[in-house]
Curated annotation (Swiss-Prot):
Annotated Fe cation 2 binding sites: 90, 142, 174, 177
Highest taxon of the lineage: Bacteria
Database matches in PANTHER family: 5-DEMETHOXYUBIQUINONE HYDROXYLASE, MITOCHONDRIAL (PTHR11237:SF4), COENZYME Q10 BIOSYNTHESIS PROTEIN 7 (PTHR11237)
Name of the protein this chain belongs to: 3-demethoxyubiquinol 3-hydroxylase
GO biological process, one term: ubiquinone biosynthetic process
Coiled coil segments of this chain: none
Gene: coq7
């Protein structure tokens, strides 16, 4: 197994953070929208799709920050590797949503550095509470993200087949990440913390739709 020193790991995370916030992340898998015919959207529908996909892109910026922080401060190598693997898979989502935003003639959230910093802080706190609680944070996060993506599939214009294809694959991946964290011994997040996470998510999604 390749040994990665703490300094090398820091450099990797720093490089990843720069790529995440600058919008130059590269996907390791083809976009689910590849080969899907682009439906005809009027201006209002295009703006609405762009707003929802911007929210989804912000979610992936936050996912990158969370996983990087949790990997950085994980207490065991196995958990660290799981966070790093999930982070690489989530980077696909980041690239896919950024590409779709460009196709819709829009842009990522202007507040991405703020979202990233806040999510990294939350991930650090979760990791410091121990691996079981950190994994539980992943399970709850992925559960909320899955619900949010499924809601978006109902809110996107039905003819926006490209965005729908991306969101559907993202939802399936989130389920897999949550299941993997659960299998590693996740400890459930307390109800009060769940409500706090939902409140933070509401602020983020409402703001990112417009900015």
């Amino acid at each position: 197994m390749e040994y990665i020193s703490p300094f090398d790991r820091f450099i990797r995370h720093f490089d990843s953070a720069l790529r995440v916030m600058s919008g130059v992340s590269a996907a390791s898998r083809p976009s689910p929208a590849s080969g899907v015919a682009d439906g005809v959207l009027d201006d209002a529908e295009r703006r609405h799709s762009a707003g929802l996909m911007r929210v989804n892109h912000v979610g992936e910026v936050c996912a990158q920050a969370l996983y990087q922080a949790q990997a950085q401060f994980a207490h065991s190598d196995a958990i660290k590797q799981q966070f790093e693997l999930a982070g690489r898979e989530e980077e696909d989502h980041l690239a896919w949503t950024a590409q779709r935003l460009r196709e819709l003639g829009s842009h990522p959230s202007l507040l991405n550095p703020l979202w990233y910093a806040g999510a990294y802080a939350l991930g650090t706190v979760a990791a410091k509470l121990g691996d079981a609680r950190s994994l539980g944070f992943v399970v709850e996060t992925e559960r909320q993200v899955e619900a949010h993506l499924n809601e978006h599939m109902n809110r996107l214009p039905p003819q926006d087949a490209k965005s729908l294809a991306v969101v559907a694959q993202m939802s399936a991946d989130e389920v897999a990440h949550g299941s993997a964290a659960q299998a590693l011994g996740a400890q459930a997040v307390p109800p009060l913390a769940q409500k706090g996470m939902q409140a933070i998510s509401k602020i983020m999604t409402t703001t990112a739709y417009y900015i």
